[in-house]
Amino acid sequence: RWLGLSWTEGPDGEGDHGPYLQSQRSDFYLQAWQRLAQQKDIYPSPQSRRDLETAAFAPHVSDEGESVFPKNYRPNEWVVPEHPGRVPWRFRVPDGKTIQFVDKNFGLVQRVAGTDFGDFVVWRRDNLAAYELAVVVDDYHMEIGEVVRGKDLLTSTARQLLLYEALGWKSPDFFHTNLVLDCNGERLAKRSNGMTIRELRRQGVTPEKVRNHSLEGIRISRHDSSWPNK
């Protein structure tokens, strides 16, 4: 709210598409999991990260540096339980299929399943929906018409489009923005102790400056913009 941004619905107000906290939306995610499981679009995948690192058939790496899950770990048969339990579940991608969409900023985007990304997790070991499934379910049930996010999630969009298709849902439009970088050319992220809104406020940066810089990054297509040193 300090930035002057307001929203029509959310956890701190009324709305027609709640609940708005993912911790309160477990039933929505479970229904989607059950549908995918019955269709055999997903399978249990108990392998740990260490298993993948030490496997004789190590995962290959895509052009974007993403590890592609080895097809050798796909089970031939499995019983569909009533609940996912405490084991990861992966979506089986259609190998060789080109997933394409027209991004409102970058234009035509294409990814090849099985090459640019592999079978991906939709249900986590701690018995919670993984990011890819949760955002698809939320956006569909909340009737989101346009998703705006960073261009580092372009491949995630391809994965999510496969989920929309498998669930028989219409997907929203997508607008992927350029990334905001610091003065060293690094993306602003929690994991790298990137600059936060709280820190900008402490330094006396005005809401107007933050908004203007963000808008400038959206306007410039196909080029990253660095945070000004002023």
Specify the residue positions occupied by each region the protein language model found.
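Active-site cores that bind ATP or allylic diphosphates and position pyrophosphate for catalysis
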Residues: 44, 49-189, 196-201
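Conserved alpha/beta enzyme-core scaffolds, especially Rossmann-like or related mixed alpha/beta domains
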Residues: 1-53, 174-176, 213-216
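Non-catalytic terminal extensions that flank enzyme cores
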Residues: 2-3, 8, 82, 94-97, ...
